[in-house]
Design a protein with these regions (language model features):
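Non-catalytic terminal/accessory segments
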Residues: 1-599
Length: 599
């Protein structure tokens, strides 16, 4: 039998080559065992693999028998997803809480299999302007597109849809899926996931709209829904764009001709009179650099979306932006059954920063002239600048994490973090390094990146003060204690290979190199369909703990979240540490009686 992944690669290629193709009989691929090994391989390494839904069902205990039960329930139509367990996490920079839905692991596994099938069809047809929750795309690819393509913009429209993920209309979504996929069983299964409901404080609640945040399928379903918005904006762009031949403005032409006349006069003059005319010549040249060379009759619209956040750049008037905003409002209300937020959908002049994906975006207005060969150019004029919002993002991070306090003169003073004192020295420096690298890596595209140098200083001395406070010592003694011969400081620790030292992260090395010219090709999804290691290990029918090899014995996967948390006291822990794997194929007896000890 041909591997399912090979079939899906062919489907993906067909989807790319024939954009209007409609796909049928996809449900049958959910009745093939090999897709569940791929789904499990994709899921078990995630932190949430051991997080329970409403049932005691996690990545631990996966087996061939479990796959057979899933396939049988899908085949005879008895499968119904369990309600998700509702929990809340804090929103960034807000006191509000974000609802999160935790499905059971069996539901996650089936959702992942459905996601793999849907992705093979939809990924090749999604527009280049969409960057959220897609392979080889990220916040950085969206920002690099803005940097590369938004140059010369005069206005920004910052888009915000009210409660986007909570307000996706189920009937509209299924209708959109049915345009591309003619498979009643697949549509019904997706509808079951949408209508599964949630359990909060052990009370069941129905779901009438939205996709559960935390669900495996939710990001892809949201992209399918918002793909309609992408298509609409690109159609709007075709109507709006007007790139006429640029004509030099009369004011610019008149001043330019006057400068030429003065230049000819200068050749005939001498002495004080020449100096006086030269001064006039320089003043007019300076004024010329501030005038727009051509009439602003061109109209260009550019658009980028990441999940439910989008931004539009407009080369046109403010009235054009208001017209675009009104068109968006009508489309989102009539077609998507959602609302565009009037308060948060802002029209911003490009000389002022517009906020998108945690960056401030603006277009430079520069009168600085640089010589390029024989010609002088305003090299930065009209280029897009990506900036770190230092006051909002970095200042807030420092306050939230209690890294420093602000003195009366507005300067910062690094302090120790009380809540980290019970951690080991190695854990403390690891936390600080992780936070510093995370921020520096995310803001590596910013033109004001070097302003994070002071933030790195605050982080380093807060780390040192935390370790000093832990040991009840002074800052200078702590530095002396952990400094090596090169003058750098780090925390020594020991592993099997010998003694090591973890240094505090070097600020200059935290920034990843980026190329703004990189473009992403729209290619079919390639899975690589050789049988995966996990499938081979399970089908070998050999216990990796006791060595039992019996065709009549059931074999299961034992799963742990982190190998580094294992103490190595038990035989099975030593086996996992030796293999450096989160999974261990064990027989039923070892799993129940040796590892879980009759649990």
């Amino acid at each position: 039998m041909k591997p399912t992944m090979a079939i899906l690669e062919r489907i993906s290629k067909n989807s790319q080559e024939n954009i209007d193709e409609v796909f049928t009989r996809l449900y049958r691929y959910l009745l093939r065992p090999d897709i569940y090994y791929v789904a499990y391989q994709n899921l078990y390494s995630n932190k949430g693999a051991s997080t329970k839904g409403i049932l005691d069902d996690t990545a631990d205990g996966f087996s061939e028998e479990k796959i057979k039960k899933i396939i049988q329930s899908l085949k005879d139509g008895t499968y119904y997803p369990q309600p998700v367990r509702r929990m809340y996490i804090a929103k960034k920079n807000s006191k509000k809480m974000r609802p999160l839905g935790i499905p059971t692991f069996t539901d996650k596994l089936i959702q992942e299999a459905v996601r793999i099938i849907l992705e093979s069809i939809y990924e090749p047809v999604f527009e280049d302007v969409s960057h959220g929750f897609r392979p080889q795309r990220s916040c950085h690819t969206a920002l690099k597109t803005i940097k590369r393509e938004f140059g010369g913009a005069r206005w920004f429209v910052e888009g915000d849809i009210k409660g986007c993920f909570d307000n996706i209309d189920h009937v509209t979504l299924i209708g959109l899926i049915n345009l591309k996929i003619k498979d009643m069983k697949m549509s019904q299964l997706i509808y079951k996931f949408l209508k599964a409901g949630y359990l909060e404080n052990w009370q069941y609640h129905k779901t009438y709209s939205g996709t559960p945040q935390g669900g495996i399928l939710s990001p892809l379903l949201a992209n399918i829904y918002l793909h309609e918005l992408d298509k609409f904006v690109l159609q709007l762009k075709m109507k709006f764009d007007r790139e006429s031949p640029e004509r030099i403005t009369p004011e610019y032409r008149e001043l330019h001709n006057e400068i030429k006349r003065i230049s000819h006069r200068l050749k005939k003059l001498e002495g004080e009179e020449k100096a006086k005319v030269l001064l006039e010549y320089q003043e007019k040249r300076k004024r010329l650099t501030t005038l727009p060379c051509t009439s602003q009759t061109n109209k260009v619209l550019k658009y980028v979306r990441y999940a439910d956040d989008f931004i539009i750049s407009v080369k046109g008037s403010k009235e054009d932006c208001q017209w675009i905003k009104e068109q968006l409002k009508l489309f989102i209300h009539n077609k998507l059954k959602m609302e565009l937020s009037e308060e948060k959908t802002l029209i911003t002049h490009s000389s002022q920063p517009a906020r998108f994906l945690g960056y401030d975006i603006r277009v430079r207005r520069s009168g600085t002239i640089k010589r390029s060969g024989k010609v002088k150019k305003r090299t930065l004029n009209g280029s897009v600048e990506l900036l770190i919002p230092l006051q909002d993002k970095i200042r807030q991070f420092i306050f939230d994490k209690k890294i420093a306090i602000q003195k009366k003169d507005s300067s910062w003073f690094p302090v120790h973090r009380k809540y980290l004192i019970r951690s080991t020295d190695l854990e403390i420096i690891t936390i600080y390094n992780s936070e510093l690298r995370g921020i520096c890596n995310y803001y590596g595209l910013a033109s004001n990146f070097n302003q994070l140098n002071y933030f790195a200083y605050l982080m380093e001395y807060s780390c040192l003060k935390t370790i000093a406070s832990k040991h009840k010592g002074t800052l200078s003694k702590t530095i002396s204690m952990f400094k090596d011969g090169s003058g750098s400081w780090g925390i020594p620790y020991e592993i099997k290979q010998g003694k090591q030292r973890r240094y505090f992260a070097n600020f200059s090395e935290c920034k990843s190199p980026y190329q703004f010219t990189d473009k992403i090709s729209q290619a079919p999804v390639l899975y690589g369909y050789a049988r995966n290691t996990l499938e081979n290990r399970l089908k070998a029918r050999c216990c990796e703990l006791c060595g039992t090899s019996d065709e009549n014995t059931s074999y299961e996967i034992h799963h742990v979240n982190k190998v580094k948390n294992l103490k190595g006291k038990e035989k099975w822990e030593m086996a996992m540490i030796a293999k450096q794997r989160k999974t261990l194929v064990v027989c039923f007896h070892c799993h129940r009686h040796v590892i879980h000890k009759h649990k």
